[in-house]
């Protein structure tokens, strides 16, 4: 909300490329950022229109290129009608993971400078988990990305990981640094890794 200036902040500052975000026009600022949420909202419309948001400046080639880039083309082709498949209200015809993939394609098409993933992988089904992991890596490459996650496999390759407990920072570092300490991150990672081994067996 603050990065998109849905609310104006009273203290501190947020910069984008070294420029205070309050110096940007709202339209330019919001086109420079993309947010992928856990609860993806889709309109009762085709997949294509849900990706482009009916923006006439976005071409079919861009949509197909973005879909390939996040590794979702096979998923789209398996649907009746492909990009013309109607997802119905709130995407009720799709699984949680499939809705997430569409939101990833949408974000890729708009090519934001800053990407925010807010628990975007929290409720995905096993069928699309690997697709989401690949899509996350490809979507975050080469751009500033802020990832809010409880699923630590999502953030393992992040340059910097900040561990919060009730809104307070308790640890900071990359994955290797945090695993080298006997802290909250390492304990949670080991629990999640053990759970994934049991699930796979």
Short names for language-model regions:
Residues 12-19, 29:
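Conserved ABC transporter NBD signature motif
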């Amino acid at each position: 909300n603050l990065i998109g200036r849905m609310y104006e902040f009273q203290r501190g500052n947020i910069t984008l490329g070294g420029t205070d975000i309050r110096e940007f026009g709202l339209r330019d600022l919001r086109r420079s950022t993309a947010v992928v949420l856990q609860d993806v909202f889709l309109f009762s419309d085709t997949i294509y229109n849900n990706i482009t948001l009916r923006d006439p400046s976005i071409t079919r080639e861009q949509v197909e290129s973005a879909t390939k880039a996040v590794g979702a083309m096979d998923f789209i082709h398996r649907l009746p009608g492909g990009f013309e498949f109607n997802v119905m209200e709130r995407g009720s015809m799709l699984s949680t993971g499939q809705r997430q993939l569409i939101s990833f394609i949408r974000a890729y098409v708009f090519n934001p400078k800053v990407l925010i993933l807010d628990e975007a992988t929290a409720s995905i089904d096993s069928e699309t988990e690997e697709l989401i992991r690949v899509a996350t890596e490809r979507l975050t490459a080469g751009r500033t990305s802020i990832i809010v996650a409880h699923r630590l496999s999502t953030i393992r390759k992040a340059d910097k990981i900040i561990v919060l407990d009730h809104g307070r920072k308790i640890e900071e570092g990359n994955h290797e640094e945090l695993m080298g300490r006997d802290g909250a991150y390492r304990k949670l990672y080991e629990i999640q890794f053990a759970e994934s081994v049991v699930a796979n067996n």
